[in-house]
Protein backbone atom coordinates (compact mmCIF):
# COMPACT_ATOMS: atom_id res chain seq x y z
CA UNK A 1 0.00 0.00 0.00
CA UNK A 2 1.49 3.34 -1.02
CA UNK A 3 2.07 5.96 1.67
CA UNK A 4 1.04 9.46 0.70
CA UNK A 5 3.36 12.29 1.78
CA UNK A 6 2.04 15.79 1.90
CA UNK A 7 3.84 18.35 -0.27
CA UNK A 8 4.16 20.75 2.70
CA UNK A 9 5.92 18.07 4.75
CA UNK A 10 8.31 17.41 1.90
CA UNK A 11 9.04 21.11 1.59
CA UNK A 12 9.73 21.34 5.33
CA UNK A 13 12.05 18.32 5.38
CA UNK A 14 13.97 19.25 2.24
CA UNK A 15 16.37 21.81 3.85
CA UNK A 16 17.24 19.40 6.66
CA UNK A 17 17.88 16.57 4.22
CA UNK A 18 19.99 18.75 1.95
CA UNK A 19 21.96 20.08 4.93
CA UNK A 20 22.80 16.57 6.14
CA UNK A 21 23.73 15.55 2.61
CA UNK A 22 25.97 18.60 2.23
CA UNK A 23 27.78 17.82 5.50
CA UNK A 24 28.42 14.28 4.33
CA UNK A 25 29.75 15.52 1.01
CA UNK A 26 32.01 18.04 2.75
CA UNK A 27 33.34 15.41 5.16
CA UNK A 28 33.94 12.98 2.34
CA UNK A 29 35.68 15.61 0.25
CA UNK A 30 38.09 16.47 3.06
CA UNK A 31 37.03 20.11 3.36
CA UNK A 32 38.30 21.11 6.83
CA UNK A 33 36.03 22.33 9.59
CA UNK A 34 37.03 25.35 11.66
CA UNK A 35 38.05 24.68 15.26
CA UNK A 36 35.84 25.98 18.06
CA UNK A 37 35.76 26.20 21.88
CA UNK A 38 39.41 27.27 22.01
CA UNK A 39 40.41 27.25 25.69
CA UNK A 40 43.64 27.95 27.55
CA UNK A 41 44.43 25.45 30.34
CA UNK A 42 47.28 26.77 32.46
CA UNK A 43 48.59 26.10 35.98
CA UNK A 44 51.83 27.58 37.32
CA UNK A 45 52.66 28.48 33.68
CA UNK A 46 52.28 24.92 32.35
CA UNK A 47 50.04 25.93 29.43
CA UNK A 48 48.01 23.92 26.92
CA UNK A 49 45.59 25.19 24.28
CA UNK A 50 42.55 22.94 23.77
CA UNK A 51 39.80 23.00 21.14
CA UNK A 52 37.15 20.98 19.29
CA UNK A 53 36.20 18.99 17.18
CA UNK A 54 38.17 15.83 16.50
CA UNK A 55 39.33 16.17 12.86
CA UNK A 56 38.27 13.92 9.99
CA UNK A 57 40.13 14.06 6.67
CA UNK A 58 42.14 17.07 7.82
CA UNK A 59 44.71 18.04 10.46
CA UNK A 60 45.39 20.99 12.73
CA UNK A 61 48.37 23.30 12.98
CA UNK A 62 48.68 25.81 15.81
CA UNK A 63 50.34 29.18 15.39
CA UNK A 64 51.39 31.52 18.20
CA UNK A 65 52.76 35.06 17.94
CA UNK A 66 55.87 36.29 19.74
CA UNK A 67 56.82 39.81 20.85
CA UNK A 68 57.90 40.59 17.28
CA UNK A 69 54.40 39.57 16.15
CA UNK A 70 55.83 36.77 14.04
CA UNK A 71 53.70 33.63 13.80
CA UNK A 72 55.41 30.40 14.83
CA UNK A 73 54.06 26.96 13.89
CA UNK A 74 53.47 24.52 16.75
CA UNK A 75 51.97 21.01 16.80
CA UNK A 76 52.27 20.89 13.02
CA UNK A 77 49.75 18.67 11.18
CA UNK A 78 48.36 17.07 14.33
CA UNK A 79 45.14 15.12 14.76
CA UNK A 80 45.08 15.97 18.47
CA UNK A 81 42.80 18.65 19.85
CA UNK A 82 45.36 20.17 22.19
CA UNK A 83 48.79 21.74 21.93
CA UNK A 84 51.36 22.37 24.67
CA UNK A 85 52.57 25.96 24.28
CA UNK A 86 54.48 26.18 27.58
CA UNK A 87 57.90 26.60 25.97
CA UNK A 88 56.65 29.68 24.11
CA UNK A 89 54.69 31.52 26.82
CA UNK A 90 57.40 31.18 29.50
CA UNK A 91 59.77 33.28 27.39
CA UNK A 92 57.97 36.39 28.63
CA UNK A 93 55.13 35.88 31.11
CA UNK A 94 54.09 39.55 30.92
CA UNK A 95 53.32 39.43 27.18
CA UNK A 96 49.76 38.96 25.87
CA UNK A 97 50.08 36.06 23.42
CA UNK A 98 47.86 35.48 20.39
CA UNK A 99 47.27 32.01 18.97
CA UNK A 100 45.17 30.44 16.27
CA UNK A 101 44.26 26.92 15.18
CA UNK A 102 44.38 26.24 11.42
CA UNK A 103 42.35 23.41 9.85
CA UNK A 104 44.58 21.98 7.12
CA UNK A 105 43.48 19.46 4.42
CA UNK A 106 45.15 16.06 4.77
CA UNK A 107 47.20 14.23 2.18
CA UNK A 108 45.30 12.98 -0.87
CA UNK A 109 42.50 15.46 -0.16
CA UNK A 110 40.77 17.57 -2.77
CA UNK A 111 43.42 20.26 -2.34
CA UNK A 112 46.49 18.27 -3.26
CA UNK A 113 48.95 15.62 -2.18
CA UNK A 114 50.15 17.12 1.11
CA UNK A 115 49.11 19.09 4.18
CA UNK A 116 49.38 22.75 3.17
CA UNK A 117 49.29 25.96 5.16
CA UNK A 118 48.41 27.82 1.96
CA UNK A 119 45.57 26.58 -0.25
CA UNK A 120 45.20 28.15 -3.69
CA UNK A 121 47.01 31.25 -2.42
CA UNK A 122 44.84 31.55 0.70
CA UNK A 123 45.33 30.57 4.32
CA UNK A 124 43.23 27.55 5.38
CA UNK A 125 40.27 28.06 7.74
CA UNK A 126 41.38 29.10 11.22
CA UNK A 127 40.00 30.23 14.57
CA UNK A 128 41.64 32.74 16.88
CA UNK A 129 42.11 31.89 20.55
CA UNK A 130 41.44 34.49 23.24
CA UNK A 131 44.55 36.49 24.12
CA UNK A 132 46.57 34.88 26.90
CA UNK A 133 48.67 36.88 29.37
CA UNK A 134 50.48 34.29 31.52
CA UNK A 135 51.17 36.59 34.50
CA UNK A 136 47.47 37.39 34.77
CA UNK A 137 45.80 34.25 33.42
CA UNK A 138 47.71 31.18 34.63
CA UNK A 139 46.04 29.40 37.53
CA UNK A 140 47.94 28.98 40.77
CA UNK A 141 48.58 25.38 41.77
CA UNK A 142 47.66 23.89 45.13
CA UNK A 143 50.25 25.05 47.70
CA UNK A 144 52.06 22.69 50.05
CA UNK A 145 52.69 23.31 53.75
CA UNK A 146 56.40 22.69 54.24
CA UNK A 147 56.47 22.74 58.03
CA UNK A 148 54.62 24.08 61.06
CA UNK A 149 55.00 24.23 64.81
CA UNK A 150 52.75 25.29 67.68
CA UNK A 151 55.06 26.88 70.22
CA UNK A 152 53.08 28.03 73.24
CA UNK A 153 50.87 30.88 72.07
CA UNK A 154 52.34 31.00 68.55
CA UNK A 155 51.51 28.90 65.51
CA UNK A 156 54.37 29.13 63.00
CA UNK A 157 53.72 27.91 59.45
CA UNK A 158 56.05 27.80 56.43
CA UNK A 159 54.64 27.34 52.89
CA UNK A 160 56.80 25.59 50.29
CA UNK A 161 57.92 27.87 47.45
CA UNK A 162 56.73 25.91 44.38
CA UNK A 163 58.80 25.67 41.20
CA UNK A 164 57.39 26.88 37.89
CA UNK A 165 58.39 26.13 34.29
CA UNK A 166 59.70 29.68 33.83
CA UNK A 167 63.48 29.66 33.37
CA UNK A 168 66.24 32.18 33.87
CA UNK A 169 69.84 31.34 32.95
CA UNK A 170 68.82 27.70 32.61
CA UNK A 171 67.31 27.49 36.11
CA UNK A 172 63.62 27.02 36.90
CA UNK A 173 62.18 29.90 38.90
CA UNK A 174 59.91 29.61 41.93
CA UNK A 175 56.54 31.34 42.19
CA UNK A 176 58.16 33.87 44.52
CA UNK A 177 60.89 34.64 41.99
CA UNK A 178 58.30 35.21 39.26
CA UNK A 179 55.71 37.21 41.22
CA UNK A 180 57.83 38.76 43.99
CA UNK A 181 55.80 40.66 46.60
CA UNK A 182 52.74 40.33 44.35
CA UNK A 183 52.49 36.74 45.63
CA UNK A 184 50.83 36.23 48.98
CA UNK A 185 49.33 33.45 51.05
CA UNK A 186 46.11 33.19 53.01
CA UNK A 187 45.86 30.88 56.01
CA UNK A 188 42.45 29.78 57.22
CA UNK A 189 42.52 28.23 60.69
CA UNK A 190 40.21 27.09 63.47
CA UNK A 191 40.32 25.34 66.81
CA UNK A 192 40.25 21.58 66.40
CA UNK A 193 36.93 21.34 68.25
CA UNK A 194 35.29 24.38 66.58
CA UNK A 195 33.78 25.30 63.21
CA UNK A 196 34.49 29.03 63.53
CA UNK A 197 37.24 30.08 61.11
CA UNK A 198 39.74 32.92 61.03
CA UNK A 199 42.06 34.07 58.24
CA UNK A 200 45.43 35.75 58.03
CA UNK A 201 47.32 37.08 54.99
CA UNK A 202 51.06 37.43 54.41
CA UNK A 203 53.18 38.55 51.45
CA UNK A 204 55.94 36.14 52.49
CA UNK A 205 55.97 32.34 52.79
CA UNK A 206 55.68 32.36 56.58
CA UNK A 207 52.94 32.87 59.16
CA UNK A 208 53.22 33.54 62.88
CA UNK A 209 49.74 33.50 64.41
CA UNK A 210 48.60 34.14 67.97
CA UNK A 211 46.74 31.09 69.32
CA UNK A 212 45.63 29.70 72.66
CA UNK A 213 48.21 27.63 74.47
CA UNK A 214 47.45 23.92 74.80
CA UNK A 215 44.68 24.02 72.16
CA UNK A 216 44.84 22.02 68.91
CA UNK A 217 44.37 23.95 65.64
CA UNK A 218 43.54 22.85 62.09
CA UNK A 219 44.38 24.98 59.04
CA UNK A 220 45.01 25.17 55.29
CA UNK A 221 46.66 27.76 53.04
CA UNK A 222 45.96 29.32 49.62
CA UNK A 223 48.26 31.23 47.29
CA UNK A 224 47.04 34.56 45.92
CA UNK A 225 48.15 37.30 43.51
CA UNK A 226 47.38 40.73 44.95
CA UNK A 227 47.24 42.56 41.59
CA UNK A 228 44.62 40.28 40.02
CA UNK A 229 40.97 41.26 39.88
CA UNK A 230 39.86 37.75 38.88
CA UNK A 231 41.39 34.29 39.20
CA UNK A 232 43.18 35.61 42.28
CA UNK A 233 43.38 32.59 44.60
CA UNK A 234 44.65 29.04 44.29
CA UNK A 235 42.85 25.93 45.56
CA UNK A 236 43.41 25.26 49.26
CA UNK A 237 46.20 23.01 50.46
CA UNK A 238 45.48 19.84 52.39
CA UNK A 239 44.14 20.58 55.88
CA UNK A 240 46.48 19.68 58.73
CA UNK A 241 46.05 19.77 62.52
CA UNK A 242 48.69 20.38 65.17
CA UNK A 243 47.68 17.35 67.29
CA UNK A 244 47.84 15.11 64.22
CA UNK A 245 51.34 16.40 63.56
CA UNK A 246 52.43 15.69 67.13
CA UNK A 247 50.98 12.18 66.87
CA UNK A 248 52.70 11.70 63.52
CA UNK A 249 56.01 12.92 64.94
CA UNK A 250 55.63 10.61 67.93
CA UNK A 251 54.92 7.61 65.72
CA UNK A 252 57.79 8.55 63.43
CA UNK A 253 60.22 8.85 66.35
CA UNK A 254 59.10 5.47 67.69
CA UNK A 255 59.62 3.84 64.28
CA UNK A 256 63.01 5.51 63.79
CA UNK A 257 64.06 4.53 67.32
CA UNK A 258 63.03 0.91 66.73
CA UNK A 259 64.97 0.78 63.45
CA UNK A 260 68.08 2.27 65.10
CA UNK A 261 67.82 -0.20 68.01
CA UNK A 262 67.48 -3.20 65.68
CA UNK A 263 70.40 -1.98 63.57
CA UNK A 264 72.54 -1.56 66.70
CA UNK A 265 71.70 -5.07 67.95
CA UNK A 266 72.47 -6.51 64.51
CA UNK A 267 75.86 -4.76 64.42
CA UNK A 268 76.73 -6.00 67.93
CA UNK A 269 75.76 -9.60 67.11
CA UNK A 270 77.69 -9.43 63.84
CA UNK A 271 80.77 -8.09 65.63
CA UNK A 272 80.62 -10.88 68.25
CA UNK A 273 80.25 -13.51 65.52
CA UNK A 274 83.25 -12.14 63.59
CA UNK A 275 85.39 -12.06 66.75
CA UNK A 276 84.55 -15.71 67.54
CA UNK A 277 85.48 -16.75 64.00
CA UNK A 278 88.83 -14.97 64.23
CA UNK A 279 89.61 -16.67 67.57
CA UNK A 280 88.64 -20.09 66.21
CA UNK A 281 90.86 -19.58 63.15
CA UNK A 282 93.76 -18.44 65.33
CA UNK A 283 93.37 -21.52 67.58
CA UNK A 284 93.21 -23.83 64.60
CA UNK A 285 96.41 -22.37 63.15
CA UNK A 286 98.14 -22.86 66.53
CA UNK A 287 97.26 -26.55 66.60
CA UNK A 288 98.42 -27.15 63.04
CA UNK A 289 101.84 -25.43 63.54
CA UNK A 290 104.60 -28.00 64.63
CA UNK A 291 106.59 -27.17 67.78
CA UNK A 292 110.23 -26.17 67.23
CA UNK A 293 112.96 -28.24 68.92
CA UNK A 294 115.04 -26.37 71.42
From Swiss-Prot:
PANTHER family: INTERFERON/INTERLEUKIN RECEPTOR, TISSUE FACTOR. GO terms for biological process: blood coagulation. The gene is F3. The lineage of its organism: Eukaryota, Metazoa, Chordata, Craniata, Vertebrata. This is Tissue factor. GO terms for cellular component: membrane. Residues 1-28 form the signal peptide. The chain crosses the membrane at residues 252-274. InterPro entries: FN3_dom (IPR003961), FN3_sf (IPR036116), Ig-like_fold (IPR013783), Interferon/interleukin_rcp_dom (IPR015373), Tissue_factor (IPR001187), Tissue_Factor_CS (IPR030472), Type-II_Cytokine-TF_Rcpt (IPR050650). Interacts with HSPE; the interaction, inhibited by heparin, promotes the generation of activated factor X and activates coagulation in the presence of activated factor VII. It comes from Mus musculus (Mouse).
Amino acid sequence: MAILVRPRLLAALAPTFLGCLLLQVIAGAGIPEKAFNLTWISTDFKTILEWQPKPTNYTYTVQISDRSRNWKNKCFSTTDTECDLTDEIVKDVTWAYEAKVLSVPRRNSVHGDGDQLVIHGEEPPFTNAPKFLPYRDTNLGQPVIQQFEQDGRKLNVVVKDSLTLVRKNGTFLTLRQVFGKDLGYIITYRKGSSTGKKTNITNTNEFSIDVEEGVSYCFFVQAMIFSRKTNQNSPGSSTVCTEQWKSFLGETLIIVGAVVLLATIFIILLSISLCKRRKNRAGQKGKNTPSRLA
